[in-house]
């Protein structure tokens, strides 16, 4: 892979603190530096350096340092995005294990390698545009309570890929043995699993239906999507209506819902994940410990997670969403374009439309 330009992005800590009111955020002049380089045809190495004058930890989920086949970069060819064939994982930012964070002392660096051909088909070869953007939750000092976040956007780079070599890279996701597509996979969803998921789908259907109505005329649309455009309202309402319809199709929907980790992508702290390219949603063990219904606030319940995961699925509504941010405090800081493509903004709006 040849780089046409250097790829060095300095990331400043955004004044986004998840544990504080939005109008009373702690300020900081510290930051992070990320460098991405080629180490093979489609392999890349990311190096992140703590440029602050104090210790910090960053959440590795959905970053370059996530071991799972999550979306680490965006790839485009001939002006169109290359489809992403990996997973989108959902976690509760207020309930994460210590091992989900990577600590860095001042001046310390950490690096990770990954192969972009594991989650995208690059067998056509030729010239590709690579770029990345997102939000990295940060813990300042000891502990695991997220206190701020890094918002970053990299420069676009051009790379030349050997298509034949890229075609030899094995997909990061194992094949799962599945029956013909059904809404609920009865091989993994049995007994209490099936009953709990059926109730969650009913809850999610209610969330999505009320959100569709609120999207058309509600007064909190600007809060979550940073626009009041009638056309955007209509589009968001259409996504919610499609989600509600999917929730009401337990035996003939557009996705397959699994109650056990058939793709082996669960780990501690992960609640559920979606594989858009396979129209599959999978619940991880922590999902089954969530409350069935939450009546106020924005804490996740089983139905909330269903809305989040279904927002990812392009088989339900195109285009599917991604994960720029999680939780109310992060999500309401996104700009309109980011918010409209972020799964948790839809789940949060649905909660706001249904709860006290």
Curated annotation (Swiss-Prot):
UniProt xrefs under Gene3D superfamilies: 2.60.40.2970, Collagenase (Catalytic Domain) (3.40.390.10)
Cleaved signal peptide residues: 1-19
For this record, an example GO cellular component is: extracellular region
Q: Name the SUPFAM superfamilies for this protein.
A: Metalloproteases ('zincins'), catalytic domain
Q: Which cofactor is essential here?
A: Zn(2+)
Does the record bear Protease in its keywords? Answer: yes
**What GO molecular functions are on record for this protein?**
metal ion binding; metalloendopeptidase activity
What is the protein named?
A: Neutral protease 2 homolog UREG_03761
